[in-house]
A protein has these predicted regions:
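Short alpha-helical segment of the dimerization/phosphotransfer core of two-component systems
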Residues: 8-13
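Conserved catalytic submotifs in the C-terminal HATPase_c
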Residues: 34-39, 56, 61-71
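Short alpha-helical segment within the cytosolic histidine kinase core of two-component systems
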Residues: 45-57
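Short helix-loop "hinge" at the ATP-lid/N-box region of the Bergerat-fold HATPase_c
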Residues: 90-91
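Short beta-strand/loop element within the Bergerat-fold HATPase_c
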Residues: 97-109
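Short conserved segment of the HATPase_c
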Residues: 122-136
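Conserved glycine-rich
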Residues: 164-165
Length: 184
């Protein structure tokens, strides 16, 4: 048991170091992320397909509402990581037999990617801090959801680097919705 415990602690330390290095790399001011025309619908579909097995393991329904051919100027790799991170987070906190929705909308002014989970909500006093490094609400500090509180901080930095904005709302009626917005 002691060896297993030590191995688990070493693995968690490695994950923490990896996340901190990723955040430091993203925050480097002198790096310009190359932007190109990317079909957001295609990236959103790929992200959801990659996470279907995780949803299945948790008995969570992963639904999508995507529009066809939604092209914007962005970075494909960053966008894929952003959507995947938000979906993983939603699946992590959605209770068994719950639902997660990935929705894409676009009008003449903006493109929005929304990830919504309907079960677990974030307390109003925690909302201003969800993108802070190492922040975890008291509700999320369980052994079931091991994390360091860096995932959303990394996601926010990535969104900023590709000229998007990220926001979150949470209430018992709608659940928790993370929205990534790109101006057109």
């Amino acid at each position: 048991r002691w060896i297993d415990s030590s191995q688990m602690a070493a693995k968690r330390m490695q994950q923490l170091i990896t996340q901190m290095l990723k955040l430091a790399d993203i925050e480097r001011k002198n790096i310009t992320i190359p932007l190109e025309e990317v079909d957001v619908s295609n990236i959103a579909m790929k992200s959801s397909l990659q996470l279907e097995s995780l949803a299945y393991e948790k008995s969570v329904t992963l639904d999508t509402e995507l529009i066809q051919s939604c092209v914007i100027q962005t970075n494909e790799d960053y966008l894929m990581q952003i959507i995947s991170s938000l979906l993983e987070n939603a699946l992590k906190y959605e209770p068994q037999n719950g639902k997660v929705l990935l929705k894409l909308t676009q009008d003449k002014h903006k493109t929005c990617i929304c990830v919504q989970n309907f079960g677990t909500t974030i307390a109003q006093e925690d909302l201003p801090h969800v993108f802070d490094r190492f922040y975890r609400s008291d509700k999320s500090r369980t052994n079931e959801t091991e994390s360091f509180g860096l995932g959303l901080a990394i996601t926010k930095e990535m969104v900023n680097k590709i000229h998007g904005e990220i926001s979150v709302t949470s209430n018992p009626q709608e659940g928790t919705i993370f929205t990534v917005t790109f101006q057109r």
